[in-house]
């Protein structure tokens, strides 16, 4: 596998250019690879060996303490959440989506009732003041969509995701 070629084609794919293709680095041996400056957004890094790799600065999720963030729900709704200091949290190498083991619901668009929103596929309702816990939590930075409660650091990102 020619990593440089794969990443160049991935960049073309991100830009919607001809001959571009999404990078699939599943199971790739990236030991000691210098990935600084590489745009890995949307790349499949599942089971990739990243031991000793020089990675881009990817930590956007605060490592300690509680903090406020935004959760995209169904029908374009976005709620403000708090990630408690006791929650496990991470974000992936390939995007700006973060995830936590639990969150507290703070505010949402609904002013009339305590239900701020829902995720019908997951059967989860978000009520003002409620603590919501993930069924399980996966801290693997190589995977963007995996177990945990997903959220974004900025409202703008959450609104984009909710309305895509």
Located regions from the model:
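Intrinsic low-complexity/IDR segments
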Residues: 1-27, 31, 36-41, 46-164
């Amino acid at each position: 596998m020619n990593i440089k070629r794969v990443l160049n084609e991935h960049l073309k794919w991100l830009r919607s250019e001809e001959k571009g293709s999404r990078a699939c680095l599943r199971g790739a041996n990236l030991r000691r690879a210098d990935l600084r400056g590489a745009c890995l957004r949307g790349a499949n890094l599942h089971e990739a060996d990243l031991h000793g790799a020089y990675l881009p600065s990817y930590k956007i999720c605060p490592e300690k303490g509680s903090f406020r963030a935004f959760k995209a729900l169904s029908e374009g709704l976005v709620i403000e959440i708090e990630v408690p200091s006791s929650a496990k949290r991470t974000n992936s190498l390939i995007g700006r989506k973060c995830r936590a083991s639990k969150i507290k619901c703070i505010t949402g668009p609904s002013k009339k009732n305590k239900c701020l929103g829902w995720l019908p596929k997951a059967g989860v309702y978000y009520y003002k003041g409620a603590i919501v816990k993930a069924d399980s939590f996966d801290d693997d930075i190589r995977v963007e969509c995996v177990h945990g409660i997903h959220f974004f650091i900025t409202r703008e990102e959450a609104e984009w995701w909710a309305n895509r």
